[in-house]
């Protein structure tokens, strides 16, 4: 191997910083940025090897994997030898100053813990509580799974890769890590679009049948299937290569190798990345802006003719709360990823920007902001939804500063009253059957509606009012006894304290409700 202190431009093209700033390979800038900052902190010039070894992935890959920008397919060995030879002209210690290691460890470690733990708690709350198993919440579970995947299976390993500049996890996981990154972001974005469409249909066209659980699962399957197909190239183009470094042990790099040429010089890569940025950012943002704008006009801009029942009013308020929460989720997504995409579009048009002295630290901040999007959704759910908030309190009730309290009752069950007795002060409606007769008492002085039913085979009283959901529900038509219907609060307490505790809460609350009704 011929020792050369510098790469020849004729053989290897432009290996300057701007070459790594191409928007089609944004993550390629990250390790170069850290290398430049590292070199500047040691007051030593950055050798060519520091520019040759760089993170290079697709523009929406959610990852930062160290890789080599190879000159051409089949020249891997020559590029590695030339990179190693260039190390003879300077020293490049793959060591980040300790204070920067602490800083980035806090930022990335905190992000991984909050994103993974928070999203898994959201999944647990929905899947273990019957009252939370709604169409929108199932989509939220899908979104949480995708966010938990990228934070635990991709960010964690890439953070180690950033610090040590070595990929010790093997070639298979090099491929799998990039595949998971692309799969997760596609699934997240498509799920957000599905939620916006579901809210649009439910609010704009309320007479259409609501989405069934089977349809919900089918849509989730289509989302993951489409995301898998889009992410498949990651399993094909990524590979690992061992690169010798003078004075240090060999380093293994994980990099993309496109069939028609190296990264930054591949037409296939450019077309693929353009498709990805359209499908996973611009198209979803436009789609969700249109749907939520139409929904917002319907919920906040339209007026109802005539008087509304309290339940109708509360239904509108409930829909507004859900839409507000999802709009915040979409806004956070757009804000987190806008600087990321803007950076690479701008630097592709104006490469000179990449020579600015502050560009390295700026990119690190932009990258962390984009990756941190996965940790904000659980915080938003806990902040804007009382049931998710109660579920989080139950999980962290062992903390001294957490007070569980009582869960707000279901508003849909709280308001079962109807102001329908404007004609006469009192009226009774009696319905007789062979096995059952029911009497409905409606009183204008109270919004409460009491219904007492007696079965023919056995006697069981059911009192339904506008108070909590802890009221009793009658047993089957032929059973005789009665069974208690657990509220959301009781379901959560039963998960943590056992059935005896939930039964005690049910009995006490039911007795209180019955006393209040009869009084």
UniProtKB/Swiss-Prot annotation:
What are this entry's molecular-function GO terms? Answer: neuropeptide receptor activity; tachykinin receptor activity
Tissue-level expression reads: During late embryogenesis (stages 11-15), expressed in the brain and in a specific subset of neurons in each neuromere of the developing ventral ganglion. Expressed in the cortex of the adult brain, which contains the neuronal cell bodies.
- A GO term (biological process) for this protein? positive regulation of sensory perception of pain
Keywords, comma-separated and alphabetical: Cell membrane, Disulfide bond, G-protein coupled receptor, Glycoprotein, Lipoprotein, Membrane, Palmitate, Receptor, Transducer, Transmembrane, Transmembrane helix
Say yes or no: keyword Transmembrane helix present.
yes
Cytoplasmic face of the membrane: 124-134, 198-217, 293-324, 385-519
Q: Which InterPro entries match?
A: GPCR_Rhodpsn, GPCR_Rhodpsn_7TM, Neurokn_rcpt
Q: Give me the stretches of Low complexity compositional bias.
A: 500-519
Its primary localisation, in coarse terms, equals membrane
Q: Which GO terms of the cellular component aspect does the record hold?
A: membrane; plasma membrane
Disulphide bridges, residue numbers = 174-254
PROSITE patterns membership: G_PROTEIN_RECEP_F1_1, G_PROTEIN_RECEP_F1_2
Task performed by this protein? Receptor for tachykinin-like peptides.
Protein name (record): Tachykinin-like peptides receptor 99D
Native organism is Drosophila melanogaster
